């Protein structure tokens, strides 16, 4: 395996499948099996899931809800998604722990860095819910922060597209996919890979990002085996 310890970032929208809202159980099962394939190879896995399939804090103002309140609602949405994925993983025999950026003691552990690393060393999959625990920070930023804290070797951003393109491939048939791009090049070209806070955290800590299609069977394992899948962003 090319990477020993990873952070996998999944969008909440990906869990919807073909639905317009909520969680598609078939997507959960498929993702769980993809994750099991790399867990069986001895990879230490941490996961951050977005909450956009349930609620987006940034949209709160449009509905008359205070932005900070909306962000906390979004954090709770990520915990719901983590719990759903946790169940899917445990149903196929994987040992997991869910850690939250806010205290929800009856449901999950609070995030403690040393404890998270110890769980990984014991072979458990660790999921990080509730973002950073602070409003105004995205789950991409939470993914970057947690990856740095637990000393992950790479952030794998599983999406519904197979990498980063020179232009929107749905609008421009001549668009080509980058196999590798530097942080500075991505910034100069205005490529929307992550929000700027998340992106800068990765750059300043020399943490590479791989953007790949999580919905293509076997892709996650291929990334870990070092195959040229998706787009690698590095210094």
Curated annotation (Swiss-Prot):
GO terms for cellular component: cytoplasm. Gene3D superfamilies: Acetylglutamate kinase-like. ATP binds at residues 9-12, 52, 56, 159, 165, 168. The keyword Cytoplasm applies. Keywords: ATP-binding, Cytoplasm, Kinase, Nucleotide-binding, Pyrimidine biosynthesis, Transferase. One of its GO terms (molecular function) is UMP kinase activity. Its EC number is 2.7.4.22. Homohexamer. Belongs to the UMP kinase family. This is Uridylate kinase. It comes from Cytophaga hutchinsonii (strain ATCC 33406 / DSM 1761 / CIP 103989 / NBRC 15051 / NCIMB 9469 / D465).
């Amino acid at each position: 395996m090319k990477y020993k310890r990873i952070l996998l970032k999944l969008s909440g929208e990906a869990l919807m499948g073909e639905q317009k809202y909520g969680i598609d159980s078939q997507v959960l099962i498929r993702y769980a099996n993809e994750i099991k394939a790399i867990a069986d190879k001895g990879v230490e896995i941490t996961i951050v899931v977005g909450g956009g399939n349930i609620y987006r804090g940034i949209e709160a103002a449009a509905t008359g809800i205070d932005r900070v309140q909306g962000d906390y609602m979004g954090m709770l949405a990520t915990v719901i998604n983590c719990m759903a994925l946790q169940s899917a993983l445990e149903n196929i025999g994987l040992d997991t722990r869910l850690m939250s950026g806010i205290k929800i003691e009856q449901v999950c552990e609070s995030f403690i860095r040393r404890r998270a690393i110890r769980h990984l060393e014991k072979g458990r999959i660790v999921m990080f819910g509730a973002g950073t625990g602070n409003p105004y920070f995205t789950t991409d930023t939470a993914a970057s922060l947690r990856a740095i804290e637990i000393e992950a070797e790479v952030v794998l951003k599983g999406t519904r597209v197979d990498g980063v393109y020179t232009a929107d491939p749905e609008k421009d048939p001549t668009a080509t996919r980058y196999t590798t791009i530097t942080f500075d090049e991505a910034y100069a070209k205005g490529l929307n890979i992550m929000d700027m806070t998340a992106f800068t955290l990765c750059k300043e800590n020399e943490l590479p990002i791989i953007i790949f299609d999580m919905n293509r069977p076997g892709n996650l394992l291929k990334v870990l085996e070092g195959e040229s899948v998706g787009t690698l962003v590095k210094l």
